[in-house]
Each structure stands twice: as structure tokens, then as C-alpha cells.
Amino acid sequence: MTDTSVFEDKKAAYYTLGCKLNFAETSTIGRSLLAQGVRSVRPREVADICVINTCSVTELADKKCRTMIRKAAREHPGSFVVVTGCYAQLSPEEIADIEGVHLVIGSEKKLDIADYLDLERPRDAGASIVRGRTKDIRTFRLSSSSDERTRHFLKVQDGCDYHCTYCTIPKARGRSRSGSIAEIVAEAERIAREGAREIVLTGVNIGDFGKGHPGEDFFALVKALDEVEGIERFRIGSIEPNLLSEEIIRYSATSRRIAPHFHIPLQSGSDEVLRLMKRRYDTALFRSRVELIRELMPHAFIGVDVIVGTRGEEERYFEECYQFLECLPFSQLHVFSYSEREGTAALSIEHAVTPRDKQKRSQRLARLSEERLQDFYRANLGRELTVIWEHGNYDGRMMGHSENYIRVAQPYDEAAIGTTTRITPQHLDASGTFVY
């Protein structure tokens, strides 16, 4: 264990890549170091400690992590550089070889970074690695963000028992596990007391909530959180379509606090490609969920994830995907190009898509997405929206988000931060922001 006296008057810089779950966990790491006397750096200060929380969902994500690690070491010369997160769990030796790295810490111990910081170790001694076996990760560790925004991220679940053929995340995060409803509700109440007005529920597979807690499931959690006073709005983070039940959708439509905002990973609109991916639903189920949302909440924001160019995605299957999406009432697509990942079952599937075809398919879906997003914006012009105003002064403007996740701007007013306003926007600027 580290002598905590070495932390006195030390400063830390934090870098986070990837998902909302990572942001929640980085905040938890920051709070644990603050309790030891380590404060966050201010602008233009040089840190004593750099913590980089990484992502490894694609090859590009790995590349961005390496770039960020080198950037942190360069901007904070002489600092103790710690790398954690999914990339650190999957490729610790690769990270340890990067110049300037002193500690690589895997998924299980990431929230215990303070216990492994040896600030007195010579900076030229090379990197040490703290990493256990992923299959041994069984404990759920609660995390939540605590930045200056009125929106907080709350981790309710971790890990994944699905083994989609293209994905490495179960190898990085371990088996599915979650907190209890009582634990999550207590944390939401604590966040409310700190002044938060909106909470985003995050995890790797949040719809799988309840593992290890008999009688508890995600629907029960949603209903319990809907009773938390002080929080005006809960957003359901990305949720698998087979776990987004009709009862959750129907409840959300009449709820006091659950936002009409859904993020649902489709991955492909071809049933054959879904089979190759080992996804747990078909296009008929996905369509039924989206159509029910649109029926009960006509102005809900529905974001859909799609991966293009996966192994086995022949041209005819991509066309099936495109035609399926053309008929689906979504609001926006999040399009990802397939990236081959070492150790995944997808590598055994024949028919690899060329980079050029991946790019063409991605561009087609991006155009479709932009058309739908503009349609969504136009449908909301002139409608009354409820906006929670956030921290931040952007050239004299402040930003907020509506219940259905439309960004809204108004002249900066510090007194408005954290307050709620009902507005009827009439103008959309070039950045996709409603102006009030």
C-alpha cells in the first residue's frame, strides 16, 4: 500500500476516452485521489500525476489512446503517468512499452489507483503492470460523475455476458454484474443533494441489471429511480433491444422523470448479419420496439447504432440493412466502421469487406442519418420544450438540453444554471442548436 503522505499538495490531470461509463469511473478515481489530498490541475498547470482512462472498442480507439498517452506525458513533463481502462486490460504490455508510462492498471483495480501509485519510484524505471484475469472480475464498483455539469452519469451495471462475434468488451470488463436497487437509489439521492438535475444511467449492458440480486431487474430500477426527489430527469443510456421491454417503454411514456430519449444498438438491419454477429434479436423485434416508442412518444429522440463492413456483410446484406433503416422511424444513426479485433470469433467468418466499401457504406448511412436528424429538428420547431440549463459560457451563450435531447442555446446567465425553462424555439442554427 502507498504512503498517503506523498500525495500532499499533489496535482492530477485526467483524460478520458470512450463511453459515458468511463467518464463516471474517471470521476470516481478523481474523488478517491482528492480524498488523499490530490487536487485536479487548473488550466496551464503541470500535473504531478496523469491518469488516462482508455477505450478499446475499435482499432481506431486504441490509436487514439496511444496518442492521448503521449500527449499527456508531453504536456506534463516529469509526471507519474497511469493508464487504465479497457485498453489497459486487453493490451497492458503494449502500453507499458510507450515512453513515459509508469503504471498500467487493469479493469478490476482501476478504482483503487491510489493504492498503486509509487510516486517516489524513479521515472526511468519503466512501467509496472497491475492486471488480473478478466474472468476473475466479479465485484461491482459504484461510480458516478461529479463534474460541473447539471447532467451526471451514474453507473448501474458493468460487464457483459453476451459474446457478440465482433466485440472484445467482455474480455475487458468481465461478467455482467450490478449494484442493488437500494444502492443505486441512494447514490442518485446523493447526487441530487449535490445539485444535479439530470442523471444518465450507464453501464456496459444496462438492461441486464439485477445480476446477483434476486427479484431485481432493470424495470424495477427504473420505477424506483422515478421516485427520487430532486432529480428532474433520468435518461436511459444505450440499451439492448431485446432488453428494452414493452413494459419499460410504456412506463417511460407516462413517467414523471424518465426522458423520451432512447439509444438502441441495432448493429445491422440484415437478419443474416445479426445471426453472424450472434446478436439476440432480429429486425422484427427491433422494429416493434422503435415503432412502439414512436407511437407512444411521437417526439422522442431515438438514436440507433449501426456497424458497417462486418465480416460476412455482403453487398446484398448491406442493401437489406439500408432498406430496413429507410423504413424505420429513428432520429439519428451512430455509424461505426467494423474494426477487426484480435481474439474475436468474427475473424473466422468468410468475406471481409474492403476499406473502400466500408467507407462508401458508412457515407450512405451518414447521409440518411443527417436527413432524419434534420427532419427531427424541424418537427420540434415551434413545440414547447423543457430545457435544463447547464454550466459553461460559450462566447456569451449557455447551453441546455430538452427532454428529447435537443441542444438549446440562450444568452449566458449564471443565475440560470441548473434551472428549468419551458421554451418554444423558432430558429435552428448551423451547428444544430435551437436558439431561444
Residue ranges, per PLM feature:
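Proteins enriched for Cys/Gly/acidic motifs involved in redox and nucleic-acid/cofactor modification
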Residues: M1-F209, K223, E247, F262, ...
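Terminal RNA-binding accessory module
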Residues: S348-Y436
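Residue-level signal for inorganic ion chemistry
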Residues: V51, C86, I113, L201, ...
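Conserved SAM/AdoMet-binding glycine-rich loop
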Residues: V81-V82, L90-S91, R193-F318, E326
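Glycine-centered loop/turn positions within well-structured domains
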Residues: L111, Y162, G207, N242, ...
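Short flexible coil/turn linkers enriched for glycine and charged/polar residues
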Residues: D147-T150, C160-D161, I258, S268, ...
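Alpha-helix N-cap/loop-to-helix initiation residues
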Residues: N22, T58-A61, A88, P241, ...
